[in-house]
């Protein structure tokens, strides 16, 4: 697509957005051209909060399907569109409400903590929803002496266990992108770039390794933490150990820093399904509206509402 074609699509999208009083939300993993047209760019927590606060009549969520579903749970009176409704997530697809209910039978006093990367059905049987930005804080605040099930991300769960010392039963799910970011790869990059920090998302396999957690050159944190890090550090070189599309925003903010993706080709194929044409068509035809059964939505909202209290 030529730049002229891109600009024409931008103009069409802006016109449609104004006509329909719509707001465009995009995750940092979206294509750069999607990021540029978004009204709000953020990680899962930030976008969830924006979805609950916007005055727009329509929310167009440029993210995978569970993100659009979460926006609808938070803003039931808004029309929420997901340009690619079949854009999935290996984490969200890996957890089931049935599995959680089976665990509850064995642990009637247990607490279920679910990552935001889950379906509405899973959120509905969850006690606390979390994101990578607030998971540590929420788990630390849970009452002691009660069993905890954390899911679906086993790597994030193990990282939380290592940092907090809380024992948890872990669902064995994983993000296929971050599953390739191993301890061995991180150690290789530490040796190759001795002046660099490695910024690691806690969904990564490496984040579950205590030697990585304890290494002062390894900064483990949410997408927003990773993106903000070069702005609060004097170092010039950073290895980015997460989905590489975050470099679009990081490069824009920190043009004087050297930002090196740990796996430049390991991208989220689901996020890349969302294109400018698909965004334009979603607005034009108001298609792919997200619907959540009201009884299910109310149950799912409870776990999200508890998250917002932290």
Regions found by a protein language model. Name each.
Residues 1-240, 246-310:
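Active-site loop-to-helix "anion-binding N-cap" substructures in soluble metabolic enzymes
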């Amino acid at each position: 697509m030529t730049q002229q074609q891109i600009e024409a699509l931008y103009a069409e999208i802006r016109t449609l957005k104004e006509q329909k009083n719509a707001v465009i939300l995009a995750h940092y993993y979206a294509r750069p051209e999607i990021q540029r047209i978004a009204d709000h760019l953020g990680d899962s927590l930030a976008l969830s909060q924006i979805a609950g606060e916007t005055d727009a009549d329509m929310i167009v969520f440029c993210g995978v399907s569970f993100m659009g579903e979460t926006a609808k749970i938070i803003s039931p009176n808004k029309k929420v569109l997901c340009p690619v409704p079949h854009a999935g997530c290996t984490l969200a697809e890996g957890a089931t409400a049935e599995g959680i209910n089976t665990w509850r039978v064995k642990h009637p006093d247990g607490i279920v903590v679910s990552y935001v990367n889950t379906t509405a059905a899973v959120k509905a049987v969850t006690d606390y929803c979390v994101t990578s930005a607030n998971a540590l804080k929420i788990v630390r605040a849970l009452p002691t002496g009660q069993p905890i099930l954390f899911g679906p991300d086993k790597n994030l769960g193990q990282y939380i266990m290592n940092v907090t010392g809380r024992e948890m039963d872990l669902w064995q799910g994983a993000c296929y992108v971050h599953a390739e970011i191993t301890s061995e790869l991180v150690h290789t990059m530490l040796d190759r770039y001795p002046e660099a920090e490695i910024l690691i998302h806690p969904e990564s396999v490496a984040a579950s390794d205590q030697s990585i957690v304890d290494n002062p050159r390894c900064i483990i944190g949410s997408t927003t933490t990773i993106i903000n890090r070069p702005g609060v550090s004097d170092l010039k070189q950073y290895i980015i150990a997460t989905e590489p599309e975050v470099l679009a925003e990081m490069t824009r903010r920190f043009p004087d820093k050297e930002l090196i993706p740990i796996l430049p080709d390991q991208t989220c194929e689901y996020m890349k399904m969302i294109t400018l044409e698909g965004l334009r068509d979603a607005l034009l035809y108001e298609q792919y509206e997200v619907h959540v059964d009201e009884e299910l939505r109310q149950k799912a909202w409870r776990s999200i509402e508890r998250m917002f209290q932290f």
